[in-house]
Regions:
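Enriched for short, Lys/Arg-rich terminal
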Residues: 1-27, 32-39, 53, 60, ...
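Active-site rim helix/loop that mediates acceptor-substrate recognition in acyltransferases
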Residues: 63
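Blade/loop signatures of beta-propeller domains
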Residues: 47-49
C-alpha cells in the first residue's frame, strides 16, 4: 500500500494503517483536543472494526465501502476494512466525510 503509515500493537487482531490525509487529520485532531476519543476509537477498531459500540455507519455515494464512527458532533473517523489482510485503513478523521 502506497502512502500509508502503519501502527500496530502486539496483541491486536487488526492492523491500523493511515492514508496521508488520515495521518494529517489525526495530527490535527490530536492538537484540537480529540486525542483521547481517537485513541479509544482506534482501540475498538484494532480489536474488531465491526463492533457495534460505539455505533458505526456504513457510507454510500463517493465513500461506498467505507465506514464512519463519530468523534464528536462535527468530526468523523472514516475508514475502510480490508477483510483478507485484516487491515483497517483510516481515510480521514476531520470534518464530516471530507
Amino acid at each position: 500500500m502506497r502512502n500509508v503509515l502503519n501502527h500496530q500493537m502486539s496483541n491486536d487482531k487488526w492492523r491500523i494503517v493511515y492514508t496521508k490525509q488520515g495521518l494529517k487529520d489525526k495530527n490535527h485532531a490530536y492538537k484540537a483536543g480529540f486525542k483521547d476519543k481517537i485513541i479509544s476509537l482506534l482501540s475498538v477498531l484494532r480489536k474488531d472494526p465491526f463492533t457495534e459500540y460505539p455505533p458505526y455507519e456504513k457510507l454510500i455515494g463517493a465513500l461506498t465501502g467505507a465506514y464512519s464512527r463519530r468523534i464528536n458532533q462535527q468530526h468523523r473517523l472514516v475508514y475502510v476494512v480490508h477483510l483478507q489482510e485484516k487491515i483497517v485503513k483510516i481515510i480521514s478523521m476531520w470534518e464530516h466525510y471530507s
